[in-house]
Amino acid sequence: MISIKLNFKYWLTLLFVCKFCLAQEKLIPVLIVDGQNNHDWVSTTDSIEATLRSTGRFTVEIDTAPQTKSIKGIRGPKADAPNYLKESYKNFRRIQQGAEKEDKESQEEEWKNWNPFTGRHQAVVLNYNGREWAQETKESAVEFVRQGGGLVLVHAANNAFRNWDAYNEMIGLGWRPANFGDCIKWEVLKNKPYVACVDCSSGHGSRHPFQVNVRQLDHPIMKDIPTTWMHGKDELYHNMRGPANNLTILSSAYSNPK
């Protein structure tokens, strides 16, 4: 009798552990890439991470691009300062310039070796707009997407890498100058996208709240999202341009209804 109880407890524990393991395996591993941006990428990453974790559906890691190390200088002596102060300042500048050179060389090596696309994640959230990546890193990013990885751009990430053809293909449309690829907009009356102005550059107006309209109701990404919903006060990009190949527009909004 005791043996039966022990076995029952054993199997109950085993089932619980297995169920826990399966639950853990179902979590989607996501990577946030940041480190440079024309917006406050630190706060944005914190917000993205908190949002993803709050769903209970994701594991989240963050990979920050190599950072520039700043070496603070000191103000040089005035013209009428004693010679010993001038000599001391010259010596300091020689030391500082040497340190800056070493730091630059070290940083270049860091950039060369930095590659967040390790294949351990199912999706990468790109909160980055800055320096061009090393060729190997760019190739890894392309291969990641080619193998089915998800690439999600946050705001100014579509400003990045204008001259990287593969990136333009992956994102479809981005913040680009006039005559760069096609400018795609949504024709409300015909309920389909169309090629718009040739000579218009990407941009945005003043920050304002705007209504988002879902255009692909049956798309899995839009599941359980209202047909129309209000977005808070924010910048809304317009005249996005690019190759626009294999592009599906899921939603749209007016940058300016007029």
Regions found by a protein language model. Give the residues of each.
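Short, solvent-exposed coil/turn elements at secondary-structure transition points
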Residues: 36, 66-68, 157, 173, ...
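Intrinsic disorder/low-complexity segments, especially N-terminal tails and targeting/processing regions
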Residues: 4-6, 19, 30
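A glycine-rich, often tryptophan-bearing local segment used as a flexible ligand/cofactor-contacting loop or short
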Residues: 117, 126, 130-220
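Helical hinge/lid and interdomain linker segments adjacent to catalytic or ligand-binding clefts
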Residues: 24-27, 31-161
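Catalytic beta-strand/loop cores that center a nucleophilic Ser/Cys/Thr
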Residues: 53, 59, 108-109, 190-258
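Bacterial N-terminal signal peptides that target proteins for export
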Residues: 1-11
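Hydrophobic h-region of N-terminal signal peptides that target proteins for export
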Residues: 14-23
